[in-house]
């Protein structure tokens, strides 16, 4: 049975595996100033491979990748920020939107498109076309249904949308940030 689920409603839904979904965090700085924490729930019950890639990149537990760089979001930047659209990060190899690497090697295939881009806080994979997922991701700041079927949704911001909005304010139409926005720290939150 194929699930057609709304990502924004999944965060609060009580599904069978909801209690087993990993939660991860980013502690973000804008310029040199701490901006706050963003907490995200990963939908490993719908897209397990994609969710695991992101979770492991938050913890850094996989060590160094094929490109000789730590597989870890810590210290990486939000390199593309477009107000009323999304904030994009995850390029820890080149730091400009042209790099990145998954825990499975350079790129991996689109897992499925069951989850939809239904609103602010939706966490999705950035790519360069079909089956080119690496480490780059974006967080939507508005409803973006035109991305459905082209980008794999794998999570939802559960806390810290005010921080996402602060990041969004650093953006421009071209996507170039007004200030450097850095993932100062990141990891997994253990369930209690």
Swiss-Prot record:
Keywords: Isomerase, Rotamase. Belongs to the cyclophilin-type PPIase family. This is Peptidyl-prolyl cis-trans isomerase 1. InterPro entries: Cyclophilin-like_dom_sf, Cyclophilin-type_PPIase, Cyclophilin-type_PPIase_CS, Cyclophilin-type_PPIase_dom. PANTHER family: PEPTIDYL-PROLYL CIS-TRANS ISOMERASE, PEPTIDYL-PROLYL CIS-TRANS ISOMERASE D-RELATED. One of its GO terms (cellular component) is mitochondrion. It catalyses: [protein]-peptidylproline (omega=180) = [protein]-peptidylproline (omega=0). Its EC number is 5.2.1.8. Gene3D superfamilies: Cyclophilin-like (2.40.100.10).
């Amino acid at each position: 049975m194929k699930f057609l689920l709304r990502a924004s409603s999944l965060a609060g839904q009580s599904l069978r595996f909801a209690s087993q979904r990993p939660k991860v965090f980013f502690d973000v700085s804008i310029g040199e100033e701490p901006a706050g924490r963003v907490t995200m729930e990963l939908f490993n019950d719908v897209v397990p491979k994609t969710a695991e890639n992101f979770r492991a990149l938050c913890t850094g537990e996989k060590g160094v990748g094929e490109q000789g760089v730590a597989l870890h979001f810590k210290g990486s930047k939000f390199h593309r920020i477009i107000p009323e659209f999304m904030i994009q990060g995850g390029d820890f190899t080149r730091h400009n939107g042209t790099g990145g690497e998954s825990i499975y090697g350079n790129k991996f295939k689109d897992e499925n498109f069951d989850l939809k881009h239904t609103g602010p806080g939706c966490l999705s994979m950035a790519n360069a076309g079909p089956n080119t997922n690496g480490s780059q991701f974006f967080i939507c700041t508005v409803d973006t249904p035109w991305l459905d079927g082209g980008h794999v949704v794998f999570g939802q911001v559960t806390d810290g949308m005010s921080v996402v909005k602060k990041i969004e304010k650093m953006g421009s139409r071209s996507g170039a940030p007004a200030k450097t926005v850095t993932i100062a720290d990141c990891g997994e939150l253990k369930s209690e």
